[in-house]
Amino acid sequence: MEQPIQRHTISVLVENKFGVLARVAGMFSGRGYNIHTLNVGPSHDPKVSRMTITVREKEETLNQIIKQLDRLVDVIEVVDFREGDTIFRELVLVQVNITKSTRSEVIELCDIFRAKIIDVNPNQLTVEITGTEGKLTKFIQLMENFGIKDLTRTGKIALPRAE
């Protein structure tokens, strides 16, 4: 039976050095793997960065990716995050078109979704929202009804739940 393609989230702790991101990206491209999302930032230790990578692959391919990442120089730890024991979040910044007649409805939807309005002008609101992928997708779909001028979305970030 063929394995299904699924989305997987991998956390990679790396030494915070020049060229590490290029080596990780090169491993993916050199083996024909696609990175669906990638976030990189410092961890609690300034000498260590955390890469959160999502891929859409079969389980067997995921295992290969993890093994290959673990072999790279400057990689400290590779963890495959599973949905049940991990907290996932994303961030979206969206500029939504508004009119006098739609302004209150957009603001009400922002309140319902616990989004923050971070910039206002007569024809637009800039909104910041964090949450799960599903929550953000639904919010974006609702904002499309008003007209989205611009949007940027982070990939997933993740941490294991506290024990």
Task: Describe each model-derived feature in a short phrase.
Residues M1-R50, T54-E163:
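Long, contiguous binding/interaction regions
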